[in-house]
Amino acid sequence: MTLVKQINRKRFLASFLFVFLSFGGYCQRYLTDIDSSFFIKDTVRPVLKRFENLRISGYMQPQFQVAATDGAPSFEGGNFAQFSKSRFMLRRARLKIDYLLTSKEKFPKALFTFQIDATERGVIVRDMFIRLFETKKNNLSMTAGFFARPFGFEVNLGSSSRESPERGRMSQILMPGERDLGVMFSFEPQNKTQKLNHVKLDAGFFNGQGASGTTDFDSHKDFISRFILKPYTINKKIEIGGGISLLLGGWKNGTKYVYESGKNASGDKIFVVDSSVHNFGRSSPRHYYGADMQVKLHSGWGETEWRAEYWFGTQPGTATSTANPGTIPTANGIPLPTYVRHYNGAYFYFLQNIVDTKHQLIIKYDWYDPNEKVKKKEIGKAGTNLTAAEIKFYTIGLGYMYNFNTQTKLIFYYDIVKNESTNLAGFLDDNKDNIFTCRLQFRF
């Protein structure tokens, strides 16, 4: 290699590193937002023009956890191994590449996004999509590929920005992986002087199985839509935002047997079967409705934020699970009957900065009731066909976050998990499944 080539290579690497690190303070807060670092003033861009449309970002979350018992079931990064109640793990390690084309007026014209997650559990694709923008009035866009479903606030809040280590139980069961394959159309004015620049409307069609399946196992698509009121300043001290969400979908019955809530001759709550031959191949309803609100108060003793989100709807499943499947549920290759349940759940956050933004207190409460038609000792009662899939869980999360800087933070978080006391073996009383998490996060 000649001396000139060596010098050019060193300049290239040095310039790339400078651009790479200079954007460290900027990050996407929501899963489908455009990275704000694309619109930095020309203080860094002139360093190397060839990277002016490219943005590389990422974050890493190593953590240590302790559970109350060996083999504890957990929605805080997965169940513990049978004979273990403590573990080190790399919860997430993301690398993301965004390529943005802009118009002469510096409005977005096209965006390509690719993101992977590489941990000790393997490497998976988290995002792969393209977004095309209408450039006449800069109000509309179309997104196609594998990307976040436009439903709910917590689902769409990025894991590097979320204060609690994990999303709630309901989100993980009903929206596993958060992403899905589909197409989405959006109204979101890019011009900040536009009258409606504080609102956003997303609507799209999706396969429905999300990341849990490699292809759509039936022809039924989910329609998902969300209307968002972006944080709006009422006065100098109060900000308010919110949204409403809708999902209308379903998945194909693999048999003619469809079970719904009812009562037996003794008046006990059970699942009643409909065995009409017309049920086979039909779509069982998967309908979700959601609403959320965020209120932030700015004061001299620290920023305070309240968040509330509520979901309810209808969820098809099996006798033992309410999770969305990647394929038609089977046992030994034989399709399982469909069980239709009515659910509800909610999340509540209280966030308090202590004097400054370095210290933050986190309090979270959430619940998931997979079958609101039954409760407590009705579950597992002799003569009924109710299972552990009906049990209501609620979780209280207590945490403290220390922000070393805009890129690095340390979280101490304790989850107090409670389940209904039922007549089912293993759930006669509250199980010991509380989890403590200590997490370090670095993002760039």
Can you say where each PLM-predicted feature lies in the sequence?
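N-terminal secretory signal peptides that target proteins for export/translocation
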Residues: 1-9
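N-terminal periplasmic/intermembrane-space "pro-region" immediately following the signal or transit peptide
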Residues: 2-3, 23-63, 69-71
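Bacterial N-terminal signal peptides
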Residues: 14-24
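Outer-membrane beta-barrel pore domains
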Residues: 30-32, 69, 81-82, 238-248, ...
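Outer membrane beta-barrel
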Residues: 45-68, 76, 80-211, 216-224, ...
